[in-house]
Amino acid sequence: MAGDVTERVNASINLVRSFLADARGQVPVDCDLLVDAHDAVATFALGGKHLRSMLVHIAAGEVSGDKRYAAEVFGACIDLMHAAFLIHDDVIDSDDFRRGVPTIHSVVRQRTGDYHLGTSVAITAGDLAFNAAYRLLAQAGLPGDLTTEAFRIVTDAADLTITGELLDIAHSVNPAPTPELVGTSNRLKTAVYSFAAPLKLGSLAAGRPISDMDAVAEELGGAYQVADDIAGAIGCYDKTGKVAGGDVKQGRATLMTIRLDYGLESEDLHQVVEDVIAEGQAHLTRARQLIGDLDVPKTTSDGLYGVADRIADMLVDHA
């Protein structure tokens, strides 16, 4: 199944590549900043691990014909949506690096010396990626009812993700958000669009009930966010591709930073990390139980167990 999923993810990537090339060819004027924006969308949508597209294809399973094409379209759509969120998130978080390369706002800022211009181009590039996701889905030629339901899934996910991002911003200015509030923003900004939406889209493509994936997605997403929060607080650049300790330096409220105190001794920090890792492992335990209860093909459940194992490895990296 792993090789088959890789092949299907690559088909989704090729859809994105072709769509973005066509879109760039339709740019009516020659403008360096337009080139910057389109290049940024391509860099983010075509690079990375393509976890979300992979989840679409895992949930769809070994489908063929029209169902396989629908899964390929949905995988491409979610990759473009992910690119949009990443570009905007880097602006919000003032991150100058992503995946080990400069972010779009930092590229433009460094070249022009204009901070605001870099921010403006990045915001516009994120808008381009969002619009590309919706246009690709609308123009894919899928049946109308399938397209309508897919639009509902991705727009509902986008709405909740934006809400979670706004809560995250609020936590940066409001003193001492509770772990419960941070957990809520994490669930909204990560579990919904990174796990629930892809798994629902894959189920939709295969013609299976989409609501069955909600609980699994929440637990996998919770564990994934735990691993990401640990990496953001103590991860090294070589592994994360981002500035080490960025969440601490920027004062972001995460599951790690709300537990940290600058006066911590090394053994205290170790205990904080262990506590947060345990939270992630609890999510994975529940996720595996829920996966076992799903009424899905074995290839789908095996793929989901594989995702849980992958997240577990991310947690072990920090143990």
Regions found by a protein language model. Give the residues of each.
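Short glycine/serine- and small hydrophobic-enriched flexible loop segments
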Residues: 57-61, 86, 131-139, 199-204, ...
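All-alpha helical catalytic cores of prenyl diphosphate-utilizing isoprenoid enzymes
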Residues: 29-30, 43-51, 123-127, 131, ...
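Residue-level signal for inorganic ion chemistry
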Residues: 55, 133, 164, 257, ...
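C-terminal helix-coil-helix/basic helical segment that borders enzyme active sites and/or dimer interfaces
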Residues: 64-65, 202-210, 234-239, 265-273
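Hydrophobic packing residues in well-ordered alpha-helices of helical domains and bundles
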Residues: 2-5, 9, 71-77, 126, ...
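Short hairpin/turn module used for nucleic-acid contact or packing/dimerization
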Residues: 272-319
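Divalent-cation-assisted or electrostatically stabilized phosphate/pyrophosphate-binding catalytic cores
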Residues: 99-127, 175-192, 238-280
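Conserved N-terminal diphosphate/IPP-binding helix and adjacent helical/loop segment
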Residues: 1-83, 87-111, 115, 168-177, ...
